[in-house]
Amino acid sequence: RSRGLGDVYKRQVTYYDGMVYVNLSEIKPMIAMPFHPSNVYTIDELNANLADILHDVEQKALVSLDGAVEYSLQDKIRDGKLYVDQGIIAGCAGGGFENICAAADIIKGHYIGSDEFTFSVYPASTPIYMELVKNGAVADLMEAGTIVKTAFCGPCFGAGDTPANNAFSIRHSTRNFPNREGSKVQKGQVASVALMDARSIAATAANKGFLTAATDVDVNFSKPKYFFDKNIYAN
C-alpha cells in the first residue's frame, strides 16, 4: 500500500466552487440527544431548558422505540441538574491523541466520584496509547478514577461498556441510534447515548456526572506534541 501512495498538490492556479467559513470561536459545545446524531442542542441550551427538552426527547423516543419499552430521561434530573451515568471517549472519532490529552488536562486533580457514574477512555491506536503513557496523561486520568482501556472501538457498536438498563451515556463516538450501544429491546432493555465532544465529557466527569460544557471549566491545556513510534507495528 505504501508504494501506491503519492503526493497531491494544487496547481499554480486553482478554482473552487465555494468555501465554507466557520468561526470556531463562536462554536459552543453541543450534544446530540437520543436517538439520532441530528437531534442537537447546545449544552447550555439543554441545561437551561432541561424539563422541556428531555420531555421532547422522550416523546420522540416513543416513535423510535415503537413503544416496545418504557423510556425516561427526566428521572436523571437531580436538584435541577442533569446527571449522566456514564462517560466514554473512544475509538476513531474520540480517541485521538489531542482529545485524550485535553481530557487529562481537564480532569487532572479531580475525582469522578464513587456513585453510579463511570468514565472510560479508549485510545484510537496502540502507538497513541503508548505516547499517552509516556507523557503522563494516562496517570492523570487513572488518578481521577478513569478506566483507560485498550485501543478498541467497541463502545461505538455495543461491544464494550454497554450501559445498564435505563442508563444515560455521553460519548465522543460516531452514532447514537436505538440499541446500538448494546441494549436488547426484545428483552425489554433500553439505554440512552448522547454524543458530545471529549473535552465536555471530561468536564462532566470532573463534576461527577453533572452535564458540563468544556467552556464552563478553567484549564490550561498542555498541548503536548505527538511522537509516533513505529516499533509497535514493526516488532
Identify the role of each PLM range.
Residues 87-99, 154-163, 174-178, 189-206:
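Conserved phosphate/anionic-ligand binding catalytic regions in large, soluble enzymes, centered on
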Residues 12-16, 79-82, 111-114, 140, ...:
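Solvent-exposed alpha-helices and their adjacent loops that cap or buttress functional pockets
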Residues 32-36, 98-102, 130-135, 159-163, ...:
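Short acidic, glycine/serine/threonine-rich loops at helix termini
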Residues 181-235:
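Extended hydrophobic packing segments that form well-structured cores
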Residues 3, 13-14, 21-27, 122-125, ...:
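A glycine-rich phosphate-binding loop feature that marks nucleotide/adenosyl-phosphate handling sites
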Residues 94-95, 112-163, 168:
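Extended C-terminal subregions enriched in glycine
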Residues 20-119, 123-126, 235:
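Non-catalytic terminal/interface segments that mediate subunit docking, oligomerization
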Residues 1-9:
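Single conserved hydrophobic/aromatic residue that forms the stacking wall/gate
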